[in-house]
């Protein structure tokens, strides 16, 4: 579990400049140094350990957590942390309705599944060059935005968010659905929108690594305590689904309006 030394070495105590802050974070601020807010690491350590234990215990009950972080310095770390504990993730762009309109999102995930299956079976080689090209482009875009949640068969129980300000839409959707929000809180964040806050820097690379890796470790520790595992039934792909998808990809051409479809459905 995280130590005070870890927090100091990763620069978790460095907040934003004093002109960029949320007054609600005052209780987590230790002081100011060269116009930079310094976060109280005693409180960070206490909140960090409490949150770790809660996440671990919920994972031991079979609960799941989606990892969300789309800013450049967090994207790859979010992906690696989520994969290391077998959890879903979004690390490029949060599409409106990803949770609140999950039914539509699942239809798009189904399309990705069909294209991949066709590729594995060599069926793309039997199509015209145009059809194969359009399906390949569609697959790439679906994979970019939905690759991290393609095995998410139900809504998650928890959401770990890296940068609560940037990912406010994801947090709003989670709160609307009663999904527990876990997030580090920098000095510009609103603690009222997070269920399990951990005051700390959410911009520095080493700090980001620490938060992500600890949450993944908590999930893995909890999952290890599970006695039983359940299998997932694979839905067969029909010929009609394949034909419809080929026609759809060709009709779309280079345009991919799945985001609007998810938001407006």
UniProtKB/Swiss-Prot annotation:
One of its GO terms (biological process) is translation. The keyword Transferase does not apply. Keywords: Ribonucleoprotein, Ribosomal protein. Pfam families: Ribosomal_S2 (PF00318). It comes from the Bacteria. Belongs to the universal ribosomal protein uS2 family. This is Small ribosomal subunit protein uS2. The gene is rpsB.
């Amino acid at each position: 579990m995280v130590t005070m030394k870890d927090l100091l070495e990763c620069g978790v105590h460095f907040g934003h400049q004093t002109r960029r802050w949320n007054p609600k974070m005052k209780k987590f601020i230790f002081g100011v140094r060269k116009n930079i807010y310094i976060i109280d690491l005693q409180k960070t350590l206490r909140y960090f350990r409490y949150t770790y234990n809660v996440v671990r215990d919920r994972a031991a009950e079979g609960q799941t957590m989606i990892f969300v972080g789309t800013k450049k310095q967090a994207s790859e770390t979010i992906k690696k942390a989520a994969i290391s504990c077998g959890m879903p993730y979004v690390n490029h762009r949060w599409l409106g309705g990803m949770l609140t309109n999950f039914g539509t999102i699942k239809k798009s995930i189904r399309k990705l599944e069909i294209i991949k299956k066709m590729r594995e079976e060599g069926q793309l080689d039997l199509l015209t060059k145009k059809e194969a090209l359009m399906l390949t482009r569609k697959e790439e875009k679906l994979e970019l935005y939905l690759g991290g949640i393609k095995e998410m068969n139900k809504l998650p129980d928890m959401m770990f968010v890296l940068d609560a300000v940037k990912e406010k839409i994801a947090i709003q959707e989670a709160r609307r659905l009663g999904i527990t929000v876990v997030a580090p809180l920098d000095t510009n964040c609103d603690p009222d929108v997070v269920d399990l806050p951990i005051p700390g820097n959410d911009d520095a690379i080493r700090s980001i690594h620490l938060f992500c890796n600890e949450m993944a470790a908590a999930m893995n520790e909890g999952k290890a305590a599970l006695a039983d595992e359940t299998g997932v039934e694979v839905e067969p792909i029909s010929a009609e689904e394949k034909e419809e998808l080929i026609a759809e990809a060709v009709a779309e051409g280079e345009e991919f309006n799945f985001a609007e479809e998810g938001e407006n459905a």
